[in-house]
Every structure is written in structure tokens, then in C-alpha cells.
């Protein structure tokens, strides 16, 4: 029994799409992993959709004004013709209309390959209909990634351009629609689908190893250019598919066009009608190859019993003399070779072909030839056999060519060293892989870097395609001699493994997760998918902590270079850390520190970098990702500062972004107003002025948060001065002691000065009521019980003192301890005394201590206890059952996303949420950190300076899809 290979696809963004074969009114589901309480996760309640061949004819009344023109395109023999069709309206009297049929989904494909972002989804049904969807985009605006929009539909013979937002079936009007079950095989069904990457290169982390000369782990990362067929910038996307009948469909869209196009051609000459009718392919694979703009097509025909190879070449027809003239691409098929199957193995056992898998090789490989894996079932045994081949151009020696063609211009005196590459190809056989169990599925992971075999006993083994060694045994077979040792290519290298999974007969589909840190499984008798995190059996041995932490850190970096969201790795790491914490809490904290230290090293980030470098680090994406992981792993503990330090850094980054962005946009608005000053009747002038002052208005909640935060830090200083042994209020050690947090606070104070200066220099006089936003912002900042100037001087002096200290002794270990745990190492105990004493002299002595101490600093939301409801703020099930819990096991009143988080403040804008904002269905939640926000939505009139119909874009628009922690935002149901 072979498992379905493409019935599920996990996007880089974190959205999981899978086939629904059981519902009476839906055939595809969307879900994602969602953090419930910072510790436990769940699969978000799946949204069910129905995709049927007539979907392009449906028009929802409420969104008809935003739909694009409906057109059709037909393709015959490589030519493309377009025509306009009408759009019938289905949705009114559904009871009187004939039923519409929908079919089982045969394959699902996110655009995850290479540099693609993972936001488009191709869904194929068993008849061969293909529906193209996009996430995070409505016809009129950007939206969150869990929202689907159809962009076109291909019903085998025609392509229908029709942009339409899709609704889950539970939000549709009743329809006369039913699933049509069919046992018939269709020669138009799609066997293989492949996305084509863009022309962008990617960074690939190949491995890390322990360098004994420096006593650290070093990683090797390399930039890899695109290979195979990749589309130029004037193409928005491109993809292709092979059908059972050998038909190749090639879809694409120009960047400056709304229309989607299709080119069709046949794999073989089908002039013979009888041959055309009987041609059935059982397997087909499309693989990038290193010939310029070429893909390798591998097929196996039931009729011929041959494996055949073809080269597909795409010419994008770029006009060098007229680059603005865009021509349709042209496709050409070239037959390479064909070979028969081996009937028996070396011992005479009959072989039965089970699967065909082709692994691509990038241009940086020593041998970039694609590798063909032919999987056989060895009959009358329990074994499987994988035969490995390389398809490579034939290499001819000069000596041979001299004999074959004496007239060739070859240096006969040096002919032994000359090798010539033929236009022909040959199959080179490599060593076979004998597997002691029956294989039910083969998949590739990490851009073909690994190949996983799924066995009928519920186990999975992953091999590195560079050396074909079992990844979980990589360290066991390594020599510990030499400069480099402990070579790690993935978390599996350190011994993390998938364990035993449900047996295939009970499984609808299963797949190794994107970061290779777990397996997602859907069983027939289960309502939701399940996730089995990779586990390390030998977690009790402290000596293994360093290599386990390094392996997880390297896996995280490897995933981020591939733009993978990596929540599967987070869950595996948290599971491992919690298992350690049950044995030794202190050891678990050190494990997190070791992991994060490796992350900084692999990203080449130094926590004590010079100011000019630190200014770039604090706004970088790698730091954001490091802080996300620190936040997620730190939430394993209560009463610790690991998670709080990460939240503080992320909040400070957000505040800095807000003030910096407003300062720049305010300058731009002033220039616009100045240019239009002579046009007093210009209707856009008021809009520009309003937008300018609305920018300032948007800073007021952020300014309030920052004032409250500085006050909170000073409160902690006061408490520690009076009780230096107090362990509850030591977060301030990390914030004042770590260079990164000091740099962020100083940068914010600098941006605040810029904003206040520009507001004072350019008061709004044309419409005085609008100037109230400037007045109120200055009032908020001036009411701080802590003098900002004194506070800034204090931080600058601390910086100088620490720089002098660094010259005397290394500072990396101190910085890591402060930045991760907010703890001062014992050998640096005098640092804590200095911070308290100097803060007392430089800050508190100039402030009203009573006013500071009794100031309200609630609502800062820098700890998990302020984010999640207390009813669920604990480990919700025994760790042995995993960190992912079924929604049905949660308390009844805590089964919705809204019930997980405290809905008091917008965690991006720092503004207090109104009752209407909470209940209007536009509130978003972060799937990773649990933040709630309305960022990216239209600002309600009661949140602007004066009520107006003007819709402005504020700085939080950047967080329409992604949270300040970089986690995915989704809309919570009202």
C-alpha cells in the first residue's frame, strides 16, 4: 500500500493545506499550528472549502464589485488563444438548479520551492482540474495568510481567469452540491506538478562542525543560484504539470498583467490516435537540471514498461533590443533515452516497481547530475530495494574521438588528458540501498537535500543525499580525530528521531515537517491532524546537551535561510527542554543559553558588537527570529526572565520602528504640504495635513508604553536598592546590563527627540484642532516621572564603563547571560552593584522616588502571565502525550482563539482595545507569541484626532500579515 504523496502541503508561511476525503460538502482544509498558552499548541480549527470545476462561474453578491474580468484561455499544441466569456450567477435559488459535483483532491502544492514565498497554492482534483489560489491577498487589499482567493481555474482544456475570495463552507449559503465518487481513472489527471523558482539566489546552510582549534562550532553556508528553469523578473510566477496522457501544461503570468496564460504540448508524438488513446503514464517526475533553463522529465509507462527521460527547455523570448516588449515563452521537448526495468535482483527475487523518485542537484555540487531512485518491492521477502542512477551527459575521451572521427581538430599529442562532453546522456548506476522493510512512500526534504523513506511498520528513515548515510546515525560513524569533528547536517544528525508512528492502513497521509523536526499525520478516524515531534532518547545525559543544542540551533538557521517558519522545530526543542527541566531546571536553562549562543554564532551576530554594527543588528531580521525562539523556549519556565527579555527586545524594536517611521513620513508630508502651499483650494491638502497629524496621533499609545516601561525599570532599581537579594525583580539587570537592550533604548530616546523637535518646528496652524495630537504627544512624554535626559546620560555612561571593562576581560559570556537569562554571572557580581549604585545617583536622585514607586505600570505585557488567560496558563496534558493538544480536550469555554489571550491591549499599537474592536471580527492573533492586534485594518473614526472619512495608512500597516515577533497573524472569529 502506497501512501498519498501530495495530499498535504505545508507552506513556508506555516499554513497547512490538506485533502478532505470525508466531508459531504468540502474537499480541502486549511489549518496551522497555533500556540495556546506559550507552552501547548493545537491545530487551529480547520477551515473547510469546496473546490469544484464550476467555481469560476460562481459570483458572490457581496464581493462582485471587486471581481476581475472573467475570461477564458484555451491552449492547443503549444499555441495560446484568448477569448472573453460571460459570468453566470449561481447562488440564488439553489434548490431549483441541478446539482454541481465536486471531486476528491489528488494533489496539493504550495509554491515552496527555492526562493518562492509559499503564498500560492495549486490544487488538483482526480479528473485533472487545477485551481490556483493565493493567500494573504484579496482583490482590493492585503489580508492575513489563512484567507484564500482563487485567481484562476484550469478545467483541462480551458483556463478561466476569475479572481474571487473564497469562503469556508460553513459561511456559504446552502448550495446544491455533492461529492462525486469515481473509481475510474482519467488520462487527464495530473501526475506531477512543479513550481518554477524566480531568478533570486538563496543561502543554503550545508553543515556545521566542531572546530577543535577554536573550541566552537562553525557552520558552512553558501549562496546557491537558481538552476533548472527559473523565470525572469517580468514573469510573476510560472509552473507546469504532466498528465497521465503525457500532456504538459505550462502556466504563467506576466508581472504587468492580470491574465493568467497556459501553453500545452505533448510529451510524445501523438499523431497516431490509437497510441494517443492507449498512452497511460503511471509515474512522472519533473526535476530541475543544470542545463540552462531546462527541466528533466522522467516517466514510466504502463504499456511500454520503460522508464523514459526527456529534456524540457523553456525560452522566455526576452527581446534584448526592446526590453519593454514582452513575448510569450516557447517550450521544446527533447527525448533523451529510455530504459527497461530489472525483472529480478542479484539473488533472483522478482522485483515489482513501487515508486520512482528523482532528486535534483544544485550547481554547487561536485556532480550536479540528477539522481534517479527506482524503488522496488522485493517479492516474497520483507525487503525493499532502491536502485540509484545518475543521468549525466556522456563523456568521450579524445583518443576515442580520434578513432571515430579522424578529421576532428584534436591535439593528438595531448589526447589522453582531453575529455569531451557529448550531447547524449547515459545512466550511471550507483550502489543500491537495501531496506529491510517495505517502503510505502518516498519524499524529499529541504530542497532535495534529504530523502525520507516511510515504512509499513510506521517508522521513517531520512538519508542525506550527499553521502546516502542514515542521518540519525551520522555522528556514530564519524571519526573524532582531526581539526573538525561532530559534523551536523540537521537535528537528526545528533540522534533526534521520529519514533514509531501510526501504521499506514490507518493513515490517510503523513509527511515529514518542513524543518525535519517532526511528522504530521492524518488518520482516517481522527478529526484533526496530529504532530509527532522528533525526540532525543538520550536526554538524561548532560554531556549530550552541547551537541543537541547546537544541532537544534543549526536546524533553525537552516530553516530560516529557506524562509521556513520553523514552528515544528520550536515544538521539538521545547519538548526536549521540558524533559530536561523535569530532571534539572538549571540545566534546562543552560541548554537554552547554549542553543541561543550557537544561533548568534551561526548568524554571525555578536551581542557586544561596536555601536555602528549594533545599530544594524537591532533592526535585522535574524535578531527578530532569534528573539522569537528565545521567547518560545523561555515560556517553558515560570518566574524566569528568559521569555521576558525576548519580549522586551521585540517591543523596543517595535517602538523604535514606530518613532523612526513617523519621523521620516512626517518630513515627507511637510515637503508635500510645502509644494502645495499655493493651492489653498486643493482638496488633497486637508487630507495630507490630516495624515501628517494622524501619524503623530498614532505614536501616543506607543509613547505611553515607553514612559511606563522606563518607569517600571526604575521601580525595579528602587526595589533592588532596598533589597539587593530580591530575585523577583532582576529583569532590570539584563536590560541595563546587555548592550543590545541599552542600544535600543538609546536609539528610541534619540528618535523621540527628533519627533518632538520636528513637531515643535512645524506646528499645524491651518487646522488648529489637528495640532492637538502634537500637543498631547508632548504632554505624554513630559509627564514621565523619570527624566529622559538624565536616563539617557545614565545609559551612555554605563556604555562607556562597560566598554572600558571589555578591554580588561572578555565580555561575550557576560553578554549572553544578561541577554538570555538577565542574570549577572558570579564572576561579574560587581557589575550588578555598579548598576544599582550608579542608577541611584544618576536617575533616582533626580526623580520623585515616591511618584516613581507608586506609578501604575500595569499593562506592559512583557510576560506570558499578562498574555494568556489563567485558566489555561499551565501544561495542559502530560508531556508524554506531546505539546500539541486536541481542541476537544480543552475546557469548553477555552476552545476558541479569543479565549486563549487577554483582550485588553493591541500588542502592536499599544492602544487599549474597545468593545467594538474586540467583537467586529477584525481582531488578529499571532500563532506564535499570542499577541493580539488590529494592525493593517482601517482605523475607526473614534481612534483618530477628529472623526473623518479619510482612511490613513499608519506605521502598523507593516504588520498586516506578520507579528512584531515575525509569527503569522490570523483573524479570530467574532
Swiss-Prot record:
One of the GO BP terms on file: regulation of establishment of protein localization to chromosome
Motif Nuclear localization signal: chain residues: 889-893
Pfam families: Med16_C (PF20719), Med16_N (PF11635)
GO molecular function: RNA polymerase II-specific DNA-binding transcription factor binding
Membrane-spanning segments: none
Keywords associated with the record: Activator, Nucleus, Phosphoprotein, Transcription, Transcription regulation
Region of interest called Disordered, as start-end residue ranges on this chain: 62-92
Ranges of compositional bias, category Low complexity: 63-75
Biased composition (Polar residues): 76-92
Subcellular location: Nucleus
GO cellular component: core mediator complex; mediator complex; nucleus
UniProt modification remark: Phosphorylated by KIN28.
InterPro entries named among the record's database cross-references: Mediator_Med16, Mediator_Med16_C, Mediator_Med16_N
Quaternary structure annotation from Swiss-Prot or TrEMBL: Component of the Mediator complex, which is composed of at least 21 subunits that form three structurally distinct submodules. The Mediator head module contains MED6, MED8, MED11, SRB4/MED17, SRB5/MED18, ROX3/MED19, SRB2/MED20 and SRB6/MED22, the middle module contains MED1, MED4, NUT1/MED5, MED7, CSE2/MED9, NUT2/MED10, SRB7/MED21 and SOH1/MED31, and the tail module contains MED2, PGD1/MED3, RGR1/MED14, GAL11/MED15 and SIN4/MED16. The head and the middle modules interact directly with RNA polymerase II, whereas the elongated tail module interacts with gene-specific regulatory proteins.
Miscellaneous information on this protein: Present with 1720 molecules/cell in log phase SD medium.
Protein family membership: Belongs to the Mediator complex subunit 16 family.
Function: Component of the Mediator complex, a coactivator involved in the regulated transcription of nearly all RNA polymerase II-dependent genes. Mediator functions as a bridge to convey information from gene-specific regulatory proteins to the basal RNA polymerase II transcription machinery. The Mediator complex, having a compact conformation in its free form, is recruited to promoters by direct interactions with regulatory proteins and serves for the assembly of a functional preinitiation complex with RNA polymerase II and the general transcription factors.
Protein name, as recorded: Mediator of RNA polymerase II transcription subunit 16
Lineage start: Eukaryota, Fungi, Dikarya, Ascomycota, Saccharomycotina
Amino acid at each position: 500500500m502506497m501512501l498519498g504523496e501530495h495530499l498535504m502541503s505545508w507552506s513556508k508561511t506555516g499554513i497547512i493545506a490538506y485533502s478532505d476525503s470525508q466531508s459531504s460538502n468540502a474537499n480541502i482544509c486549511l489549518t496551522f499550528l497555533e500556540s495556546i498558552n506559550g507552552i501547548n499548541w493545537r491545530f487551529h480549527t480547520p477551515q473547510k472549502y469546496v473546490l469544484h470545476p464550476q467555481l469560476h462561474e460562481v459570483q458572490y453578491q457581496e464581493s462582485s464589485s471587486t471581481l476581475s474580468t472573467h475570461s477564458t484561455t484555451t491552449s492547443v499544441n503549444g499555441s495560446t488563444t484568448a477569448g472573453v466569456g460571460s459570468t453566470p450567477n449561481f447562488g440564488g435559488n439553489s434548490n431549483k438548479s441541478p446539482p454541481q459535483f465536486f471531486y476528491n483532491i489528488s494533489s496539493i502544492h504550495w509554491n515552496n520551492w527555492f526562493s518562492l514565498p509559499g503564498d500560492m497554492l495549486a490544487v488538483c482534483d482526480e479528473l485533472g482540474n487545477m485551481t490556483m489560489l493565493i493567500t494573504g491577498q484579496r482583490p482590493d487589499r492585503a489580508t492575513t495568510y489563512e484567507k484564500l482567493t482563487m485567481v484562476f481555474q484550469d478545467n483541462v482544456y480551458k483556463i478561466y481567469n476569475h479572481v474571487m475570495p473564497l469562503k469556508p463552507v460553513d459561511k456559504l449559503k446552502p448550495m446544491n452540491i455533492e461529492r462525486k465518487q469515481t473509481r475510474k481513472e482519467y488520462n487527464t489527471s495530473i501526475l506531477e506538478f512543479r513550481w518554477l523558482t524566480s531568478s533570486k539566489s538563496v543561502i543554503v546552510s550545508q553543515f556545521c562542525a566542531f572546530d577543535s582549534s577554536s573550541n566552537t562550532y562553525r557552520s558552512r553556508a553558501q549562496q546557491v543560484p537558481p538552476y533548472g528553469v527559473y523565470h525572469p523578473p517580468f514573469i510573476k510566477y510560472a509552473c507546469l504539470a504532466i498528465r497521465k496522457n503525457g500532456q504538459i501544461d505550462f502556466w504563467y503570468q506576466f508581472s504587468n498583467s492580470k491574465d493568467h496564460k497556459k501553453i500545452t504540448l505533448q510529451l510524445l508524438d501523438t499523431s497516431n490516435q490509437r497510441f494517443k488513446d492507449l498512452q497511460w503514464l503511471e509515474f512522472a517526475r519533473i526535476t530541475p537540471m543544470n542545463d540552462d533553463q531546462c527541466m528533466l522529465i522522467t516517466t514510466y509507462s504502463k504499456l511500454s514498461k520503460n522508464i523514459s527521460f526527456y529534456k524540457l527547455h523553456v525560452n522566455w523570448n526576452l527581446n534584448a533590443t526592446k526590453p519593454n516588449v514582452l513575448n510569450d515563452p516557447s517550450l521544446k521537448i527533447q527525448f533523451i533515452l529510455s530504459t527497461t526495468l530489472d525483472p529480478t535482483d542479484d539473488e533472483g527475487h522478482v522485483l515489482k516497481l513501487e515508486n520512482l523518485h528523482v532528486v535534483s542537484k544544485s550547481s554547487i555540487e561536485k556532480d550536479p547530475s540528477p539522481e534517479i531512485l527506482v524503488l522496488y518491492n522485493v517479492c516474497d521477502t520483507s525487503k525493499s530495494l532502491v536502485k540509484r542512477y545518475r543521468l549525466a551527459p556522456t563523456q568521450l575521451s579524445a583518443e576515442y574521438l580520434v578513432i571515430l572521427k579522424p578529421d576532428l581538430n584534436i591535439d593528438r599529442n595531448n589526447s589522453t588528458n582531453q575529455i569531451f562532453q557529448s550531447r547524449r546522456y547515459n545512466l550511471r548506476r550507483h550502489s543500491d540501498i537495501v531496506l529491510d522493510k517495505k517502503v510505502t512512500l518516498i519524499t524529499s526534504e529541504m530542497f532535495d537535500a534529504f530523502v525520507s523513506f516511510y515504512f509499513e511498520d510506521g517508522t521513517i528513515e531520512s538519508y542525506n543525499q550527499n553521502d546516502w548515510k542514515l542521518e540519525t546515525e551520522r555522528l556514530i560513524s564519524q571519526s573524532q580525530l582531526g581539526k573538525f569533528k561532530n559534523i551536523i547536517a540537521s537535528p537528526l544528525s545528533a540522534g533526534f528521531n521520529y519514533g514509531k508512528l501510526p501504521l499506514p492502513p490507518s493513515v490517510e497521509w503523513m509527511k515529514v515537517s518542513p524543518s525535519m523536526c517532526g511528522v504530521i499525520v492524518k488518520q482516517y478516524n481522527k478529526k484533526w491532524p496530529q504532530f509527532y515531534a522528533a525526540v532525543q532518547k538520550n536526554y538524561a545525559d548532560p554531556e549530550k546537551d552541547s551537541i543537541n543544542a547546537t544541532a537544534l540551533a543549526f536546524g533553525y538557521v537552516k530553516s530560516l535561510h529557506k524562509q521556513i517558519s520553523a514552528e515544528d522545530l520550536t515544538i521539538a526543542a521545547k519538548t526536549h527542554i521540558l524533559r530536561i527541566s523535569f530532571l534539572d531546571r538549571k540545566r534546562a536553562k543552560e541548554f537554552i543559553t547554549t542553543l541561543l549562543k550557537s544561533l548568534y554564532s551561526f548568524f554571525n551576530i555578536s551581542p557586544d558588537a561596536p555601536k555602528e554594527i549594533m545599530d544594524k543588528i537591532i533592526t535585522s531580521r535574524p535578531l527578530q527570529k532569534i528573539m522569537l525562539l528565545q521567547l518560545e523556549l523561555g515560556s517553558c519556565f515560570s518566574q524566569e526572565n528568559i521569555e521576558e527579555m525576548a519580549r522586551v527586545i521585540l517591543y523596543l524594536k517595535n517602538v523604535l520602528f514606530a518613532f523612526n517611521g513617523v519621523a521620516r513620513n512626517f518630513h515627507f508630508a511637510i515637503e508635500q504640504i510645502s509644494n502645495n502651499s499655493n493651492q489653498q483650494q486643493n482638496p488633497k491638502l486637508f487630507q495630507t495635513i490630516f495624515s501628517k497629524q494622524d501619524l503623530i496621533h498614532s505614536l501616543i499609545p506607543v509613547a505611553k508604553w515607553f514612559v511606563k516601561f522606563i518607569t517600571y525599570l526604575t521601580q525595579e532599581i528602587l526595589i533592588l536598592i532596598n533589597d539587593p537579594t530580591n530575585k523577583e525583580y532582576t529583569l532590570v539587570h539584563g536590560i541595563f546590563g546587555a548592550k543590545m537592550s541599552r542600544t535600543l533604548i538609546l536609539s528610541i530616546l534619540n528618535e523621540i527627540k527628533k519627533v518632538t523637535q520636528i513637531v515643535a518646528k512645524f506646528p499645524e496652524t491651518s487646522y488648529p484642532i489637528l495640532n492637538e495630537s502634537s500637543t498631547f504627544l508632548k504632554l505624554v512624554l513630559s509627564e514621565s516621572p523619570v527624566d529622559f535626559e538624565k536616563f539617557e546620560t545614565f545609559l551612555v555612561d554605563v556604555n562607556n564603563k562597560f566598554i572600558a571593562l571589555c578591554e580588561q576581560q572578555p565580555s561575550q559570556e557576560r553578554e549572553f547571560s544578561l541577554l538570555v537569562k538577565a542574570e549577572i554571572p558570579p564572576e561579574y557580581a560587581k557589575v550588578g552593584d555598579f548598576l544599582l549604585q550608579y542608577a541611584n545617583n544618576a536617575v533616582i536622585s533626580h526623580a520623585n522616588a515616591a511618584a516613581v514607586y507608586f506609578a501604575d505600570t500595569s499593562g506592559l505585557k512583557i510576560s506570558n502571565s499578562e498574555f494568556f488567560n489563567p485558566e489555561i496558563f499551565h501544561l495542559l496534558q502530560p508531556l508524554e502525550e506531546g505539546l500539541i493538544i486536541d481542541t476537544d480536550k480543552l475546557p469548553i469555554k477555552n476552545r476558541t482563539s479569543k479565549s486563549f489571550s487577554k483582550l485588553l491591549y493591541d500588542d502592536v499599537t499599544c492602544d487599549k482595545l474597545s468593545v467594538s474592536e474586540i467583537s467586529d471580527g477584525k481582531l488578529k492573533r499571532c500563532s506564535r507569541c499570542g499577541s493580539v492586534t488590529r494592525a493593517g485594518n482601517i482605523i475607526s473614526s473614534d481612534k483618530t484626532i477628529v472623526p473623518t472619512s479619510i482612511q490613513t495608512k499608519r506605521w502598523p500597516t507593516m504588520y498586516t500579515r506578520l507579528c512584531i515577533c515575525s509569527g503569522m497573524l490570523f483573524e479570530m472569529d467574532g
